[in-house]
A protein has these predicted regions:
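Cytosolic regulatory regions of ion transport systems
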Residues: 1-155
Length: 156
């Protein structure tokens, strides 16, 4: 599959590398040339451009992408502008990181249905793991939830 990751901070960089590692074609985009340079040899392509510039965004192969992932973690305005421009360019499937509940509300209002909330998701998962009393130290590797439930119930 083909992905465009916009915003190459910690989350965007990790997503781009992981998607590439499992066989996907990934193009990364960030305005920061240093971030682009750090990633350019690890993924199919990396481009330095301003994602709030409609003309610049329109130079990207948006229609060829299976999904476009917007991962800005600090700048609410840049995220909203980028998403609005992508929608106006009929960019296709968008997956967007929300940094607050109001950010999530605004992005949903623009028409995005797939939203990433890494801080909230981690908190939920860690709370679940902590409530098991350390029974599973590597909770993120557990995939068989049916047996996890049975084990948890057996120790109650």
């Amino acid at each position: 599959m083909k992905y465009l990751v916009i915003g190459l901070g910690n989350l965007g960089r990790a997503i781009a590398k992981d998607l590439t590692r499992v066989g996907n074609e990934v193009i990364g985009v960030d305005m920061d040339l240093h971030r682009v340079d750090m990633l350019k040899n690890d993924i199919a392509g990396a481009v330095a451009l301003d994602s709030t510039d409609k003309e610049a965004l329109s130079t990207l192969p948006l229609s060829e992408m299976d999904a476009i992932i917007v991962t800005f973690g600090k700048d609410f305005g840049t995220s909203v502008q980028t998403v609005a421009l992508l929608k106006s360019l009929d960019a296709g499937k968008l997956i967007v990181r929300a940094i607050s509940s109001i950010h999530e509300t605004v992005i949903r209002a623009i028409g995005v249905s797939e939203i990433i909330t890494p801080e909230k998701d981690f908190s939920t998962m860690y709370t679940s793991q902590a409530s098991l009393g350390g029974l599973f130290r590597h909770w993120y590797k557990v995939t068989d939830t049916e047996h996890l439930y049975k084990i948890g119930r057996a120790h109650v």
